Each structure stands twice: as C-alpha cells, then as structure tokens.
Amino acid sequence: MALDATFYALVGLILFFVLIAYLKVPGMVGKALDARADKISNELAEAKRLREEAQSLVAEYQRKRKDAEAEAASIVAAAQREAEMLTAEAKQKTEEYVARRTALSEQKIKQAESDAINAVRAAAVDLAISAAEKVLASKADAGAQETLFKKAIGEVKARLN
C-alpha cells in the first residue's frame, strides 16, 4: 500500500467526518433545519390566520356597505315621498289661494258693478227729480209744488231703501 496523496486525502476525509460526528454537527444542522421549519410553519400559520381575519373583515365591510346602501336607498325613498307630499301640499295651497283670490276679485267686481248701478240710479233719480222740479215749477203753484215734491222724495226714498 502506498502512502500517496490519495491515501492522505482519504485519511483527511475520514478525520473530517469523525470530527464532524464528534462535534455533533449533524444534530446542530438538524436542529437548525427543524428550527427553520418551525419558523416557516409558524409564519404559514400566522399568514393563514391573517388571511382568515382579512376575509372576515372583507365580509364585514361588504355587509356594512350593503347595509349603508340599503339605508341610503331608504333615505332617498323617504326624501322622495316627502318631496312629493310637499309638492302636493304646495299645489293644493296654491290652488286654494288662487280660488280665494278669484272669489275675492269676483266679489269686488260684483260690488263695483253694484256701486256703479247704484250711482247710475242715483244720478238718474237726481236728474228725474231735477227735471220734475223744473216741469212742476213751470206748471204748478208754490203749495202744489211743495206737496208734489215731498211726495216724490218719499217715493224715491222708499224705492231706494
């Protein structure tokens, strides 16, 4: 057997393996790998927990969004009903106001017509009295004129009242 470089390389390799076994390097490497595997496993579990939490938050926010949309739709519907009610009420009040104003205007027109008719009648009566006075003054004496005048005034008063 020759003691060449291959032999010394083999002896060095064997000594290296013995030294590694003596220092328990495989156990340390195993522990390190186990620790790394545990760390990765914990990180995966944490990631799964965070994912589930995020999904529950998303579901909660979607539920809240749907509730908010439903509430907004309810508010809009209530506002529309109130606006329609206010519009109908305003229309009714406007119609009542117009009807009252029309009735008041018609009443004022009737009163003005009545006043005009009464004024025309009064003017006609005054004119008739004046004409009768002139005719009677020219045809009758003083005593007869006074009697006729009083009688005519009484008749006019009776007819006007």
Curated annotation (Swiss-Prot):
Origin: domain of life: Bacteria
Pfam family for this entry, one: ATP-synt_B
Transmembrane portions of the chain: 3-23
Gene Ontology, cellular component aspect: plasma membrane; proton-transporting ATP synthase complex
Keywords assigned: ATP synthesis, Cell inner membrane, Cell membrane, CF(0), Hydrogen ion transport, Ion transport, Membrane, Transmembrane, Transmembrane helix, Transport
Cell compartment(s), UniProt: Cell inner membrane
Protein's membrane topology: Single-pass membrane protein
MF GO annotations: proton-transporting ATP synthase activity, rotational mechanism; proton-transporting ATPase activity, rotational mechanism
Quaternary organization: F-type ATPases have 2 components, F(1) - the catalytic core - and F(0) - the membrane proton channel. F(1) has five subunits: alpha(3), beta(3), gamma(1), delta(1), epsilon(1). F(0) has three main subunits: a(1), b(2) and c(10-14). The alpha and beta chains form an alternating ring which encloses part of the gamma chain. F(1) is attached to F(0) by a central stalk formed by the gamma and epsilon chains, while a peripheral stalk is formed by the delta and b chains.
Family annotation (NCBIfam families): PRK09173.1
Function comment: F(1)F(0) ATP synthase produces ATP from ADP in the presence of a proton or sodium gradient. F-type ATPases consist of two structural domains, F(1) containing the extramembraneous catalytic core and F(0) containing the membrane proton channel, linked together by a central stalk and a peripheral stalk. During catalysis, ATP synthesis in the catalytic domain of F(1) is coupled via a rotary mechanism of the central stalk subunits to proton translocation.
Family, per entry: Belongs to the ATPase B chain family.
HAMAP family in the cross-refs: ATP_synth_b_bprime
Protein's UniProt name: ATP synthase subunit b 1
Organism: Rhizobium meliloti (strain 1021)
Gene name per UniProt: atpF1
